[in-house]
Amino acid sequence: MLLWVQQALLALLLPTLLAQGEARRSRNTTRPALLRLSDYLLTNYRKGVRPVRDWRKPTTVSIDVIVYAILNVDEKNQVLTTYIWYRQYWTDEFLQWNPEDFDNITKLSIPTDSIWVPDILINEFVDVGKSPNIPYVYIRHQGEVQNYKPLQVVTACSLDIYNFPFDVQNCSLTFTSWLHTIQDINISLWRLPEKVKSDRSVFMNQGEWELLGVLPYFREFSMESSNYYAEMKFYVVIRRRPLFYVVSLLLPSIFLMVMDIVGFYLPPNSGERVSFKITLLLGYSVFLIIVSDTLPATAIGTPLIGVYFVVCMALLVISLAETIFIVRLVHKQDLQQPVPAWLRHLVLERIAWLLCLREQSTSQRPPATSQATKTDDCSAMGNHCSHMGGPQDFEKSPRDRCSPPPPPREASLAVCGLLQELSSIRQFLEKRDEIREVARDWLRVGSVLDKLLFHIYLLAVLAYSITLVMLWSIWQYA
């Protein structure tokens, strides 16, 4: 009896169940497959829970970075601004489906806010960049979630400006989970390291900086003894293009230094050299004021090119001081002091021989022995005016003592006065010749010292310039 009742109830309910199933099937075929799939995936989905069925299994997040542009390098604040293409994917075990049940759909884009997303950040972030908002992610039917987005990254970087403008900077972008340990979230590299390093396919290579490579590096670190975290570093290596700074900074400084060296060929006994070098010094000072805003400045270091400018300024000051010294030396005839013997020997013989100027530095003063011999030969003539009294006691010049015998005693005293005037004129001329000879000696000494200081100055400038050029060449092609 009971069996008969059950069969009767089944016979009555079967048409109703078949009708309901047919109605549900008709409704499912009329709804779009994307809506049905979205409802299937997101219904009862808990985005606050890590998407694994076994909590002991870590979620592996694969990441990739492609540098698109170097926007700004702020040496003063030690900040690097880059524009990158960031890609990451992970497996969400709660977002899987059979494509045959949903019109062979193999991937779907859904809002990022609707699913679980790993908390991977860049440790060096110092400011929020102006990145476009990409609100969707791609999901494949195996549960693979792909998150692609461009990022404007403003990060802290230790910038070394000592080699400016031939500097190479190495800044890191460190991706790590802010909260989860490696037992929960592990990080891996999407592509091979060689491909990441040499990928410049989208880099805008028209700016001041040249991308040398992106070097990935993975490590595990611990902030506490029991908790380890995974991090992926990308070292962005960039090099500055120095052509603009060479043209606007180095070449004007080199031209001014060359003009200072050429200024040594002006005569040392003229005042034009002093005024010329003062003009160069003032011009270089104005040049430094103009380029001061171009040079990078930090609180912890100064670029070598700044030291180069300071040394060039010091060399110009030394050159001006040397010129003033030489001009003062060659105008020393006002003091009426002859060149000391030791200075004559040192400068006109030793230094002149060293500089191959010995023949030009030999004094042309007539020997004093001939004049003394002439005086001795004429001394026997006697002083004929000594018997006439009065002005005859003045000193007689060698020409007077060699003059013919005086006229008779009754000659006029005017003759002796005339001889006395002639003697005074001769003494004046001899004194003037002596002063001129002293001036010529000091001029020879000044010329030799000027040549010596010029060679020393030239060697210092060349040695300093060659050293800097070698250093900058090594840094440029390192």
Curated annotation (Swiss-Prot):
Reaction(s) the record says it catalyses: Na(+)(in) = Na(+)(out); K(+)(in) = K(+)(out); Ca(2+)(in) = Ca(2+)(out); Mg(2+)(in) = Mg(2+)(out)
Annotated localization: Postsynaptic cell membrane; Cell membrane
Effect of residue 178 to S: Abolished 5-hydroxytryptamine (serotonin) binding to the heteromeric receptor
Effect of residue 432 to Q: Little effect on conductance. Massive increase of conductance
GO molecular function: excitatory extracellular ligand-gated monoatomic ion channel activity; identical protein binding; ligand-gated monoatomic ion channel activity involved in regulation of presynaptic membrane potential; serotonin binding; serotonin-gated monoatomic cation channel activity; transmitter-gated monoatomic ion channel activity involved in regulation of postsynaptic membrane potential
Ranges where the record places region Disordered: 389-408
Extracellular compartment spans: 24-241, 293-302, 476-478
Record's bilayer topology term: Multi-pass membrane protein
CDD domains named among the record's database cross-references: LGIC_ECD_5-HT3A, LGIC_TM_5-HT3
Known outcome of mutating residue 436 to D: Increased conductance. Massive increase of conductance
Superkingdom to which the source organism belongs: Eukaryota
Region (HA-stretch): 414-450
Function, in words: Forms serotonin (5-hydroxytryptamine/5-HT3)-activated cation-selective channel complexes, which when activated cause fast, depolarizing responses in neurons.
Quaternary organization: Forms homopentameric as well as heteropentameric serotonin-activated cation-selective channel complexes with HTR3B or HTR3C or HTR3D or HTR3E. The homomeric complex is functional but exhibits low conductance with modified voltage dependence, and decreased agonist and antagonist affinity. Heteropentameric complexes display properties which resemble that of neuronal serotonin-activated channels in vivo. Interacts with RIC3.
Name of the molecule in the record: 5-hydroxytryptamine receptor 3A
The encoding gene: HTR3A
